Amino acid sequence: MLIKGGHVVDPKTNTNGIMDILVEDGIITEIGKDIEISNGDIIYAEGKLVLPGLVDAHCHLRDPGFEYKEDIETGTMSAAMGGFTSIACMPNTDPVCDNKAVVKYIINKAKQDGYVNVYPIGAISKGQKGEELSEIGELKFAGAVAISDDGKPVKSSSLMKRALEYSSMFDIAVISHCEDLDLADGGVMNEGYWSTVMGLKGIPSAAEEIMVARDIILSEYTKVPIHIAHVSTELSVELIRNAKKRGVKVTCETCPHYFVLTDEACKDFNTLAKVNPPLRTRRDVEAVIEGLKDGTIDIIATDHAPHHADEKNVEFNLAANGMVGFETALPLAITYLVKPGHLTISQLVEKMCVNPSKLLGINKGTLETGRSADITIVDLNEEFVVDVNKFKSKSKNSPFHGFKLNGSVYYTLVNGNVVVREKVLL
């Protein structure tokens, strides 16, 4: 197969220009100008961007246990439509992904039903109860790419310290959901003007920041890397920026909703904008964008969190936290980061391909010859209107319905197989 005449961008190989890509037996074998083939599929990519397949370091596939929200088949269909070729799924399933049986189940089901590469993340604590460490070696050898109790914080500092020590033995990333539950205290949105106007219990930004500070200190103390999930506040960004300057091995991610939306999106009790950590203020949004620009924030993840309509169609206090993200993440990043000049395409590829692969220790996120052909082809300028009813995800809980965005995904190739062709899932 030949991908012809597209604008290829891959910071890992310092590629940024009009090139052809030759794919043979699912492997990238040549990148250069004017490559010819006598027979085989030719994809004409003139006027489009050709990027390494996107890698999502943080999503929820809800399988096993919550298949009424999403399963591995529908989740990976949605990922493919959004240009993602590799995704890492969080362990808050039922049963929790805290042992090799669940890891193997996810890997095998993804091989059977999956449209993209799926990598399980194991739980830090058994049952995500925060009491006893999972068998981290067992998780790693079964195929887990990281450990996290995402959805819940690790409340005990000594348990988190031990998790870091074990993670360094087994060379596996630790991803921390930073939330002080005592401070969050049952809040349902960001504490501020809008929570006051709506009469809802607020979550102070300090609930995130205190745990970010703790985890930075534990990482510094143990000399083991830590990765902070879904950073949403100005002070969190500042704490991580300062820690990096001191040489602490801390990395972090944010999600599109934290650089696009503020807590005003919750007005009129819009449960589609209810998420954890909550949407913050304009000042926080600007700080997150600044953190992306200066490299403090390494990764853009989706935190794709599908919920059944019935779980959102209730009073704000009772609604589930989270939003689907696969099919809007790249267009939101293009529209709100690349178009205004905050990031170049090359920097965006670092945050959505190169750095997530590095965190998870997987051989993805680049178009190097010899690598499997995971490739995403995007029209940077094409404008479209988000329609949640067209999402391939089982769940449609997105606050972005009706948004005008740039950046349509035209093709997604996974291991050399075309799974999305001309914006249609095959």
Curated annotation (Swiss-Prot):
One GO CC annotation: cytoplasm
Residues annotated for Zn(2+) 2 binding in this entry: 150, 177, 230
The protein's annotated pathway: Pyrimidine metabolism; UMP biosynthesis via de novo pathway; (S)-dihydroorotate from bicarbonate: step 3/3
Record flagged with keyword ATP-binding: no
Active site: 303
The EC number(s) this enzyme carries: 3.5.2.3
The keyword Hydrolase appears for this protein: yes
GO biological process, one term: purine nucleobase catabolic process
Essential cofactor(s): Zn(2+)
Entry binding sites for Zn(2+) 1: 58, 60, 150, 303
Cofactor note: Binds 2 Zn(2+) ions per subunit.
Domain of life the protein comes from: Bacteria
Gene Ontology molecular functions: allantoinase activity; dihydroorotase activity; zinc ion binding
Catalytic class of the enzyme: hydrolase
Matches recorded under HAMAP family: PyrC_classI_B
Name under which the protein is recorded: Dihydroorotase
Gene coding for it: pyrC
